[in-house]
Amino acid sequence: MKSISNNIEIQKSDKTYNISMFIGIVFSLLTTILCEMFFNSIDLGPKNIDFISRVTVVFLTIFSIYGFYVRSSIKKDLKIKNFITIFMVLFLSIIVLKFFQFLTDALINEIQSSDYGFKLTSTELTLAFPMATGALLIQSVMNTRMAAMFVFIWSAIIGFYFVDTIFLFLFTISSSLVAVSSVVKVRSRGVYLRAGLNIALLSIPFSLIILLSSESFVYIDFLICIFSGLLGGLFCYLIASGLTPILEHLGNYVTDMRLIEIATLDHPLLNELSIQASGTWNHSMVMGMMGEMASDLVGANPVLVRTGAYFHDIGKIKKTMYFIENQQGEDNPHDKLTPSMSALIIKSHVKEGVEMAQKYKLPSLVIDMIKEHHGTSLIEYFYNKALNDQKDNAEEVDELLYRYPGPKPQSKEAGILMLADCIEASVRALPEHTKDNIQVLVKKMINKIFAAGQLDECDLTLNDLYKIAGSFVKTLTGIYHQRIAYVDNKEANVNTILK
């Protein structure tokens, strides 16, 4: 069976790779045609050897870069929408470049036709071109791997079609790489401003290169270069910050900024959860703190984990009193139900949570975490209760009725959420919240979940689990810290009140 399963996985992998290669051919061909349309007039005459050789080299270069990154990419990157987005951003970058070329030529002609006391060159004004805008956009909505692919394709295009201006190629690849490294974590719109400033700072060494390569050294030329660099950084900031929300919407991308915007009490679901199920809301808040701290240690996305924690139990809104954290000393409605019916109600909060999330159009990554946060785990309390009720016919108890439908966690973030969910609830039930008690329970619960195979389909390693355990202990010890008992001096209190 294991051999058959491995063969199926290999076949699926080969199929995915073949589809990706086909997409790469189409992508490379369309990009080459786009470049020819804007940078050269296409002539299909049989004697135009330069055209054929240039197009062939450009196509093969783009396809080679694409192929290299496809081989090193993970499955979630190999989506058609990603390459459509990259093509659109390349198209936008070309339009912006042509527009700035037009402005530059017009400005140079104006300066030359009038006596302003100084001259401008196209090289100096090149620093004002927002060549890194595309890299900023791709990094914002995708990841560093896809952004790097874009940078090298875009730089290769500039290198082929602007052979006489090697300076533009060097500036394009340098500013784009600086832009990518500046927006690794986009958690506020201010990160684009920082990227713009970094790009502007890059203009200083390029300004020196321009001056050293010129025949005469004039201070005003240096100032023009610096000013052009500042404008270039400003243009990158304005264009990227303005277009990122549009790309998010068109491609349905889930960025940290989008997650931060929905993970507040302003969202109707969280507002209703905090009012209707305050116990569940408190549990979710603590989980968010636990998951966020642990995620940073294992290379997961802390913003996604925190947002997933806030929304993971929204399905409990519909039947709040059937969950113990919301009962607050009132009668337990499960006392009047059979174990199988109780398990059905408990399980239903996952399905209802997914339906509510879809109704409010939550990001797909958050919906996946709602589905996966219990995996296929067993609802032990009611399963054991059913076994006790059927002592003589224990084999008649169907275990599947007491298991969540799954799927198991498919990502590090979902795995961390599952661990935080189980551990927070268990620690809350401890009679004494000492550090030793918390530490023992955290390790016990992680070992139990791991042994049950619930983490088999996510990327968490044993080393990751060790780090997560330490982080959970630290966070929970801080939350449930012990305090000294204050002396109840009633007389002092009365005197204070009467004064």
Model-derived segments and spans:
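Extended, domain-scale alpha-helical bundle/helix-rich regions
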Residues: M1-G67, H433, I446
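Juxtamembrane inter-helical linkers in multi-pass membrane proteins
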Residues: S3, S114-D115, Y253-N271, D313
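Short helix-perturbing small/polar motifs within transmembrane alpha-helices
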Residues: S13-I19, L34-N40, L60-L107, G134-T144, ...
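Structural signature of hydrophobic alpha-helical transmembrane segments
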Residues: N48-L60, S113-A128, V163-T172
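Juxtamembrane or sensor-core-proximal signal-transducing alpha helices
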Residues: I65, Y69, I210-E215, Y237-I260
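Structural signal for the N-terminal portions of transmembrane helices
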Residues: G196, F217-F235, V305
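Alpha-helical membrane-embedded segments
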Residues: S203-I204, I224-H249
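Divalent metal-dependent catalytic cores for phosphoryl transfer on phosphate-bearing substrates
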Residues: L265-T434, K448-A452
